[in-house]
């Protein structure tokens, strides 16, 4: 069949950016004023964002917050909020009358440990089926308005039940529809807007439903929504909804609300339980328990948490775990004597005896002095500053660069260490003793152009074997390789296990490895993966039997580039010439 001539344009855009794991991400376990528990999914990139979600970090000795210093220093953080014993959510219960509580009637939140029991708020009845739910707070002691309590009111307008959440001062904090429904009549079937009920549960910033009365088939709130959709909506089944034991009307039915509690100071077991929450996130490079030595009064409890964290990091090989040597020789409540060299060494030795050495664990000591928000010079913990240095270095230069020293380790707003300053050249022997005990120190040193500055000196892991992984930069390089290559390799799982696929893998990872050479992460590399093979007889790393069982092996060899540790300069005064020329003026 003949066709009229024409020009056809087809467009294909191959400029698709390859996604790579985010750099400069760390994770703190911390006590905060508010915020989600068990959900570090939101990446915190600014201090204002942290304040909006978590309020502020609770620092027992009143010093500068680790989280604040990390975020100001350039970190991107995942925050795991640690709760204490007795933590529970707040509840709402039926008020005696539809009125706002007077000031002297405000009910304080209960601090009784255990699972919170919700009171019935809304009851659904259809035929012989009766189910109900109550409401609890989403947070554990999180502020709702300005008071210790709040109120919730429900009213009905036409066919819709609405809710209002009232501050203790009577102002409305949140409002909206709960559910719209109309039971069957002579002309119409029962109609239920079950999606509105689902939206109420998911969209409220303060409250979440908790089932009170259930049946064999309706045991969760999701089951309730599904039951309304499949068994009630657009059926002949009648539906009655009661609020507070009676049908909702235009007159508001009021409930009293309490905030719940975040519990007492967490024990070692609560800190350890929270460690599991980081396992879902492999973009994290640095992990630490913020101010833990201020919460736990005995070294035994502190070391128990560090041991659990070290074991997890050694098993997963996904994170580096940072341990702060407490800045004082005792718990801050018992005294504020700064640690000296021998006290730092003794503490690290005790820690090593309890948890062992590991390339995934690093020790930071010395404390640091900052001016706080009131302009007072404060002895502060150092891990927030360390996170900021490590993450900024990773984001700007790559995680394979050391973040200690005068180029990437200067802390311009720091006012020196809490401990004696071991950064003076005349105290090198003492600083060297600390280095031999894996202590990464906050010191003051003279810089070429900025005078005396506070900085991090040393960037060692606690690897006992004297190989290149005693440098944190090499450990972080290996983590980078793992986090970057893993999604690429995962993409090829279930693909044909043959040399054509292996060649594609090599071509995809080669630019990444070449870039690492260009960026001085490694001086050279060799990728041995049979990518150039054309038959089973040409295999050198793999063998036919394994390949035909779906197994493929690659060996990546590289020569690492470690941070410069010693410079020797020989200054020689040249000898005078042995020949002497004497000239006489004539």
Task: Please annotate each region the language model reported.
Residues 1-33, 52-266, 270-276, 553-555, ...:
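Small/polar, repeat-rich beta-turn/loop motifs that tile beta-strand-dominated architectures
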Residues 1-100, 105, 111-114, 273-586:
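Structured, hydrophobic secondary-structure cores that serve as assembly/anchoring elements
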């Amino acid at each position: 069949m003949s066709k009229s001539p024409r020009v056809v344009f087809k467009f294909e855009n191959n400029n698709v950016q390859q996604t790579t794991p985010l750099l400069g991400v760390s994770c703190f376990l911390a006590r905060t004023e508010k915020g989600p528990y068990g959900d570090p999914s939101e990446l915190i990139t600014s201090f204002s964002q942290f304040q909006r979600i978590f309020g502020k970090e609770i620092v027992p000795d009143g010093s500068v917050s680790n989280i604040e210093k990390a975020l100001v220093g350039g970190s991107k953080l995942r925050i795991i909020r640690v709760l204490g014993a007795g933590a529970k959510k707040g509840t709402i219960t039926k008020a005696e009358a539809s009125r706002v509580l007077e000031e002297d009637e405000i009910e304080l939140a209960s601090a009784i440990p255990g699972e919170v029991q919700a009171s019935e708020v809304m009851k659904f009845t259809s035929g012989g089926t009766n189910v109900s739910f109550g409401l609890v707070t989403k947070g554990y002691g999180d502020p709702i308005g300005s008071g210790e309590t709040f109120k919730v009111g429900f009213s009905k307008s036409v066919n819709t039940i609405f809710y209002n959440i009232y501050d203790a001062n009577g102002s409305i904090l949140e409002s909206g529809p709960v559910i719209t429904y109309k039971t069957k009549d002579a002309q119409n079937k029962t109609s239920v807007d079950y999606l509105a009920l689902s939206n109420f549960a998911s969209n409220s910033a303060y409250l979440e439903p908790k089932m009170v009365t259930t049946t064999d088939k309706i045991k969760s709130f999701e089951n309730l929504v599904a039951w309304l959709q499949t068994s009630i909506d657009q059926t002949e089944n009648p539906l009655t909804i009661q609020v507070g034991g009676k049908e909702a009307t235009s007159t508001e039915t009021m409930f009293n609300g309490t905030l719940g509690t975040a519990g007492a100071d967490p024990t070692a077991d609560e800190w350890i339980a929270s460690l599991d929450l980081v396992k879902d996130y492999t973009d994290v490079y640095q992990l630490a328990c913020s101010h833990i030595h201020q919460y736990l009064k005995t070294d035994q409890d502190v070391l128990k948490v560090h041991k659990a964290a070290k074991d997890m990091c050694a098993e997963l090989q996904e994170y580096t775990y940072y341990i702060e040597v407490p800045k004082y020789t005792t718990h801050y409540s018992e005294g504020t004597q700064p640690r000296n060299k021998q006290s730092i060494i003794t503490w690290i030795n005790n820690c090593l005896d309890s948890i062992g050495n590991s390339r995934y664990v690093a020790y930071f000591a010395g404390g640091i002095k900052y001016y706080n928000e009131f302009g007072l010079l404060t002895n502060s913990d150092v891990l927030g500053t360390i996170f900021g240095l490590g993450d900024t270095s990773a984001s700007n230069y790559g995680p394979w660069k050391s973040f200690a020293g005068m180029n990437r380790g200067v802390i311009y707003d720091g006012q020196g260490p809490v401990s004696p300053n071991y950064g003076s050249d005349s105290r090198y022997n003492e600083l060297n003793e600390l280095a031999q005990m894996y202590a990464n120190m906050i010191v003051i040193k003279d810089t070429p152009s900025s005078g005396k500055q506070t900085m991090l000196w040393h960037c060692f892991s606690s690897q006992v074997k004297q190989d290149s992984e005693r440098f944190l930069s090499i450990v972080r390089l290996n983590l980078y390789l793992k986090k970057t290559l893993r999604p690429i390799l995962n993409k090829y799982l279930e693909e044909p296990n043959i040399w054509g696929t292996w060649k594609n893998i090599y071509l995809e990872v080669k630019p990444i490895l070449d870039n690492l050479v260009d960026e001085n992460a490694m001086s050279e590399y060799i990728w041995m993966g049979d990518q150039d093979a054309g038959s089973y007889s040409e295999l050198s790393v793999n063998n036919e039997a394994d390949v035909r069982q779906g197994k493929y092996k690659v060996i990546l060899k590289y020569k690492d580039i470690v941070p410069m540790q010693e410079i020797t300069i020989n200054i020689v005064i040249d000898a005078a010439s042995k020949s002497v020329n004497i000239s006489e003026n004539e």
